[in-house]
Regions:
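A charged, aromatic-enriched C-terminal amphipathic alpha-helix characteristic of glycosyltransferases
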Residues: 161, 165, 175-205
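A short alpha->beta transition loop at the rim of the catalytic pocket in nucleotide-sugar-dependent
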Residues: 100, 120-122, 129
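Nucleotide-activated donor-binding/catalytic signature segment of Leloir-type glycosyltransferases, i.e.
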Residues: 58-94
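Short hydrophobic beta-strand element within catalytic cores of glycosyltransferases
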Residues: 115, 124-127, 137, 142-143
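Aromatic "clamp/platform" in nucleotide-sugar-dependent glycosyltransferases that forms part
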Residues: 107
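Conserved donor-binding/catalytic core segment of Leloir-type glycosyltransferases
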Residues: 2-25, 31-34, 38, 47-48
Length: 210
């Protein structure tokens, strides 16, 4: 990302792994959507904070990129050691701040920590209009619809994100002013640990203990 000045940076922070045949983070859909978007906007860069080789049963991302003829210079990955051993909070925040938008259109989330981390840094989100995500994005973010997909392992429905809808959301994000979103920052503050503790946990514990 050091060479990303003047570029439109699309970020994704997700584990590249699968449960059986289910790749919940939707890497293939997201990468195809980016390939379509990049043809119109060659100034776009995709940063994937993940293991590119999918050593936990995920995709071989370089193969995915090659199948879609995405130029190597249009995609960035973290340093392998940094990814394996973790980054300092300040370094991770610097990555989030460098994004113009976070792509988080997974099949479903129970919470989706990167979604909230990105917004705390002022970065808006493109998320799935499914499961917990609609409750976890600010009003100036974007939600993507898709096709319901049955997951027998969890006995529940997920959603496969619609690729043209992801492309459209990227176009909307590209058309917006660049820079931090104060709306996203203010929204994320409601999920700060001290706020959640005082606003929700203390009253709940008080009721349970009376």
């Amino acid at each position: 990302l050091m060479k990303a000045e003047g570029k439109f940076v699309v970020g994704m922070v997700a584990a590249n792994k699968a449960s059986g045949m289910v790749h919940r983070k939707a890497f293939s859909e997201i990468i195809m959507a980016f390939s379509i978007f990049h043809k119109k906007h060659p100034d776009a860069i995709l940063y994937l904070h993940t293991d590119p080789l999918g050593r936990s049963g995920g995709w071989n991302i370089p193969s995915l990129l090659g199948s879609l003829s995405i130029p190597q210079e249009a995609v960035c990955f973290p340093d392998p050691n940094d990814y394996r051993f973790g980054l300092a909070h300040s370094d991770l925040a610097a990555f989030y701040t460098s994004f113009d938008v976070l792509l988080a259109t997974s099949y479903g989330e129970g919470f989706g920590v990167p979604t909230m981390e990105a917004q705390a840094c002022g970065t808006r989100v493109i998320g799935s209009n499914w499961a917990a995500t609609p409750d976890l994005v600010s009003e100036d973010s974007w939600l993507v619809d898709g096709t319901p997909a049955w997951d027998s392992g969890q006995n529940a429905w997920w959603q496969t994100p619609n690729i043209p809808s992801i492309v459209n959301a990227l176009e909307l994000a590209y058309a917006e002013d660049r820079g931090k979103s104060q709306v996203a920052i203010d929204f994320a503050k409601d999920f700060d640990v001290e706020t959640v503790w005082k606003k929700y946990w203390l009253p709940t514990l008080g009721k349970l203990l009376t």
